[in-house]
Every structure is written in structure tokens, then in C-alpha cells.
């Protein structure tokens, strides 16, 4: 899948879940199941509830999202 096939949105982490997954509330109010991207996992970037994040959604499953960036 090419990079431009993803939908990028901003959201806020609502809750930590097991196995480095999170509940993320998007700007439009929807809540999705977010997981950390590989490079964020590799560099030990910590994500806590309340953090603003950028997520990528695939058009095939809009309930799961990849967390690709944590805003300062």
C-alpha cells in the first residue's frame, strides 16, 4: 500500500491498554484503537494519556490506527 493511501488525523490518547496499545479520540470525536509504529517502538518513545498524537488510518478498517507521531 502506498503512503498516500493512508488517512492522517490528529487525536488525543484517552487510555492505555495492554501490549502498547491505546484508545485515541480523534478530532471528529470518534474513538479508535491505536498501536505504536515500529520506529516509535524502536526509539522507546513514551506515550501517556492526554498526549496529542498523529495517527494513520487505512480506508479498509477505520477502527484501528497506527500512531506515527507524538506532539510536544
Curated annotation (Swiss-Prot):
Residues 1-72 form the S1-like domain. GO terms for molecular function: ribosome binding; rRNA binding; translation initiation factor activity. Gene3D superfamilies: Nucleic acid-binding proteins (2.40.50.140). PROSITE patterns: S1_IF1_TYPE. Keywords: Cytoplasm, Initiation factor, Protein biosynthesis, RNA-binding, rRNA-binding. It is found in: Cytoplasm. Pfam families: eIF-1a. Its main location: cytoplasm. One of its GO terms (cellular component) is cytosol. Component of the 30S ribosomal translation pre-initiation complex which assembles on the 30S ribosome in the order IF-2 and IF-3, IF-1 and N-formylmethionyl-tRNA(fMet); mRNA recruitment can occur at any time during PIC assembly. One of the essential components for the initiation of protein synthesis. Stabilizes the binding of IF-2 and IF-3 on the 30S subunit to which N-formylmethionyl-tRNA(fMet) subsequently binds. Helps modulate mRNA selection, yielding the 30S pre-initiation complex (PIC). Upon addition of the 50S ribosomal subunit IF-1, IF-2 and IF-3 are released leaving the mature 70S translation initiation complex. Belongs to the IF-1 family. This is Translation initiation factor IF-1 1.
Amino acid at each position: 500500500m502506498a503512503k498516500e493511501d493512508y488517512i492522517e488525523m490528529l487525536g488525543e490518547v484517552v487510555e492505555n491498554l495492554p501490549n502498547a496499545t491505546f484508545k485515541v479520540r480523534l478530532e471528529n470525536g470518534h474513538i479508535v484503537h491505536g498501536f505504536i509504529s515500529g520506529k516509535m517502538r524502536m526509539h522507546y518513545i513514551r506515550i501517556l494519556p492526554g498526549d496529542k498524537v498523529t495517527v494513520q488510518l487505512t480506508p479498509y478498517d477505520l477502527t484501528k490506527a497506527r500512531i506515527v507521531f507524538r506532539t510536544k
